Amino acid sequence: MSLLKTSERGFSRELPDVQSTLPDVRINLTRVGVKNVKKLVEVTRPGKRPVIFISNFDIFVDLPGSLKGANLSRNFEVIDEVLQSAIEGEVKEIEQLCSRVARRLLDKHEYADRTEVQMRSEFMVAGETPVTGTLCQEVVKVFASAIAQRTFKDPIVRKSIGAEVTGMTACPCAQNIMQERAREVMENLDIAKDKIESFFKEVPMATHNQRGRGFLSIETDDESHVKLEKIIMILKQSMSTPIFELLKRGDEGHVVLSAHKNPRFVEDCVREMARRVHAEFGDLPGDSVVTIAQDNEESIHQHDAFAERQATIAELADEINGENLDVS
């Protein structure tokens, strides 16, 4: 058993290092660590004011069966050290911060072969309404993580960055039902078919709506970079319409009209995200992993609708380019 020196009331004594003793059951543990560590994160940006995140961290290491416990205090030492380097401008992105922490954990926990860092926070996005240009803000949930694996050479690190955005969708199925009903009524009123079609182009029919939550994360190697702002933009553009905290009457009419001119199923949202990811991030390494999900809160049903896709950048490219399209 190793001993630790401590100072108490002016004298030194040696205490046993209980964590380094043998456990009663000698099996390896996949993850040992701390969860919900709240920290203020300041990330510098060239030519702009820093971005401030109030974040929750989960920090883990694996533990061999020969040790009773992990030295959890080292996790706090590492994260404070890396957060200070972020304030000093050495860290530019939150996923880079997670990567730094994961690497340093391997240095601090010499017995660990794998470390993992997860970060959850909120990001304020400034914008303006579509008609009146009223300035507004939106809170977006953001996520970052990193996993470091010890090797005989340098550690292998995989990092990810993602966001969750709320928007609005309009149901295409119910809209089609309402349109056929309106067409029947107008035909019975002897309105010409060309005028009916012209009307539908300008005034889309009513349908039920959903408040949708889109999620997108991209996992890459440690050398690649994914801009958080682009992820947020993809999410906003993949639903029927973005939503806003404050809407004047002209803005409100524009948002409702835009949504009903762009009806989308939950499946459509996920596929549109995938298309935009391919267009925006197609130059990332082919083994980069994309996770896309859409969760819609139904207005006329008691359930929610959900769709998801996980694929590599290479797999998305093959499907979007038609190379692996299943037409059976």
Curated annotation (Swiss-Prot):
Keywords: Hydrolase, Iron, Metal-binding. GO terms for molecular function: GTP cyclohydrolase I activity; GTP cyclohydrolase IV activity; iron ion binding. It is an enzyme of class 3 (hydrolase). The record marks 171 as: May be catalytically important. It catalyses: GTP + H2O = 7,8-dihydroneopterin 2',3'-cyclic phosphate + formate + diphosphate + H(+). It comes from the Archaea. Binds 1 Fe(2+) ion per subunit. One of its GO terms (biological process) is tetrahydromethanopterin biosynthetic process. Its EC number is 3.5.4.39. Its cofactor is Fe(2+). Pathway: Cofactor biosynthesis; 5,6,7,8-tetrahydromethanopterin biosynthesis. InterPro entries: GTP_cyclohydrolase_FolE2/MptA, GTP_cyclohydrolase_MptA. The keyword Hydrolase applies. Converts GTP to 7,8-dihydro-D-neopterin 2',3'-cyclic phosphate, the first intermediate in the biosynthesis of coenzyme methanopterin. Homodimer. HAMAP family: GTP_cyclohydrol_A. Belongs to the GTP cyclohydrolase IV family. This is GTP cyclohydrolase MptA. It comes from Methanospirillum hungatei JF-1 (strain ATCC 27890 / DSM 864 / NBRC 100397 / JF-1).
